Amino acid sequence: MDINKQKTKWDISIFKNENFTLPVIKSPFNTYYNKYIDSVINDIEEWHRECCFLGREKLKGYIESKPYLFSAYYYCHLNEKVLPFIIKFVDMFSIYDDEYLEKTNCSEDVINQFLDKNYKDKNIYGVEWFKIVEGLKKYGNKQSVNKFLKEFEFFIKNVHSIHLKENANYTNINFEEYTNTRSIDFGFDLVVSAAIIDCEEPSKEIRESSLFLTLNTKSSIICVLVNDIYSFVKESKQPDTMNYVKIMANKKKSIQKALNHTNKIINNTLKEIISIENQIKMQYKENNLYQYIERLNSVISATIYLHQNHKRYSVHNKNYINKNN
């Protein structure tokens, strides 16, 4: 097949003669591990056994994969009271996303049980979700919990429609359109809202400022492109173009050039983020802003660290990492 005719689909066989290595992205921010994880993890594992979302056969392997590590790094600053409920949310909903939302036959009923507390046909996911909500409301910051719930509703209503469009042609949409769509799919705003759920948001004036909005947009770009790079090997066998490395490989006729191009965008965007953070901290003297930036940076750093080190990604990428990068 002629790569110049490859417009709407991805075909890895076109690049079968090309060797490539994944870049090792370096975070400019510190990576932290939540100090309360070890004290709650036994209770979380027991909760999994009681709920048995995946069935008995898959449960052992799931627990052995240490899914709690995502919460340990993404939500490294959360206090010990709210943390268990966020871990439950992350674990349960990642399973739900894989088992239901990514399936093209996912119905509205599957989604509605998370949005209507009185929905009569709730399964174990819906039942546990509202228990989690009660815990978050009890121990989280009221304003931030409400923000999280709004982001969750937006995410669950939109992410399935994105999955349904995965076979659409993303090759010809512009960078902003692509990253905006993938930011929803990644759940960036939801992840950040969970990271600050036990503290107050910055003031409305700050949240509506162009600097703050740009900071969040740039940060979401990092998370999206890091995910695209370290998911590429696994996703390379699928025909869709919902991965920026695939899009650029089709355009540049080279996987390595696409990876290098994407890595360059990441590095340049990280520099822009640092500059924006310095500007916004000079303009606004507010402790809630400083705390928000600290947690936003931890989300970025966790994204980079986990995509390079967690088994979910490393099992596919171990033969493609460029250690000398």
Swiss-Prot record:
Enzyme Commission number(s) of this protein: 4.2.3.-, 4.2.3.46, 4.2.3.47
Family: Belongs to the terpene synthase family.
GO molecular function: lyase activity; metal ion binding
The organism's place on the tree of life at top rank: Eukaryota
Name under which the protein is recorded: Terpene synthase 11
Span of the annotated motif DDxx(x)D/E motif: 97-102
Keyword Metal-binding belongs to the record: yes
